[in-house]
UniProtKB/Swiss-Prot annotation:
Gene symbol of the encoding locus: aroE
GO molecular function: NADP binding; shikimate 3-dehydrogenase (NADP+) activity
Organism: Xanthomonas axonopodis pv. citri (strain 306)
Database matches in NCBIfam families: aroE, PRK00258.1-2
Protein name: Shikimate dehydrogenase (NADP(+))
Binding-site positions, NADP(+): D79, G128, A129, G130, G131, A132, G243
Quaternary structure and partners: Homodimer.
GO cellular component: a single term: cytosol
Active site per the UniProt annotation: K67 (proton acceptor)
Amino acid sequence: MPVSRYAVFGHPVAHSLSPAIHADFGKQTGIALDYTAIDASLEDFSAALQRFADEGGKGANVTLPLKEAAYALASSLSDRARLAGAVNTLVRNDGQWQGDNTDGAGLVRDLTERQGLDLRGRRVLLLGAGGAARGVAPALLEAGITAMVVVNRSPERADALCDALGEPARVTSRYIEDLRELGDFELIVNATAAGRDRDAGAFALPLGLVNSLTAAVDLNYGDTAIAFLAWARAAQCRYAIDGLGMLVEQAAESFALWHGVRPDTDPVYAALRAREAVLISAD
């Protein structure tokens, strides 16, 4: 029986843990699969995705900066992908790509089940308004947060995200210059890629954003999350959480869409954390 082909598309994508995660899921469930990382720029993504389909690709994950492009290329969309305006999971069906977004479900599952946070009634600051932010915002609203403030370097994108969410009573956008005037938040989510250049100054955020309950969450993991989490710890946030748990949970959601079974994420998450600890101690 031929092995089904899957991939993660991004730019850059060599650092992605998704191939290792899905390999572990396959072993756990007894499903044979070939999952690779494919680097594609925005300009090359459409052609690269078509080549992948022509070569028998059955499904794909999509990461930065391609999530909104994947949304545009999908022939059909799930409700959560349509609401997000971004796609992180593609399923090949009858010669067409179906788009979904598992980011929000992955984040909420990690925060509520693994980290033990109660999101109900919480005030949330969302940094960023691109594909990553769009993917998680609807799920945070569904989880029962009381208010969300979206801040982005481009205020037009923040406004567009707020309009798309369609909940003006709960969701507002503010200028980045207004951060000192926003009060405090129980949840601060970094959905930007500002940490990629490892500039600690990228997150010189006002300490007034933090209260005694604040959880600071970076949707990135590894080196890209270092700067934001360093700020969170210096600001004495109660929790400083990277995106590794979300990554594993959204991957499990994607795996279930492709294969009809949801794998156990705990052993995969634990193995990745252990590997991370070994890498840090080896530095």
